[in-house]
């Protein structure tokens, strides 16, 4: 059976992510209809793949001028169901859009990007909100005003009155890119990993989010020996990896156990491609300020 090393890349604004792993020719054949539920290990891999996709979307749309938003509830206003919390998040998005239009105008409102999750841990966990917000093109003073707006609009209308009352506490903190990239020393998956750590989560987003661009895969760039070297003796050698990607600097190198980063649902025959490690890199264009591990 033919097998080779694949390099798969995504452009995410000033960042690029790269996955390097072994594939076989059978994995290019058309996938049939799913016949049985995925194994626990496959579900974990699917979750991690979804987390990486979301991290790429965050990198493509939000930067240090944006905000990481957390909204919690006072006990009196805690939703009875997850769907009620989702409705609160939808209402919050609608209020933020309307407030940005009123204050900054429709032109600026077109640059408003929101990606907010209703989350909880288990059926008995407390419902709350996490996510990202940014309005491009604002001055420093306008960003401070936008931040205050984000914190004050986590509220609801008082029935029978033209007044509002807060649902609880809402904090809008400046985005720390080291936390987004997972290089702040608090877990390699960073803020996105924290959001995905909740057992139940659902996202509400504005429609103007930029999707990361998937680049053409390279199937002849890497040998098995080179991948093994990169994942072992050069795993923490940024200079070695940067020689492989001119014009980019390494932000993070993650080495995964065999089949952990990429795995087909069909079992692989015994062979080197099922036992070799896999690598996932986050790179940053050199013209931007350095973010080192």
Summary of predicted features, one role per range:
Residues 1-127, 135-293:
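Right-hand nucleic-acid polymerase module
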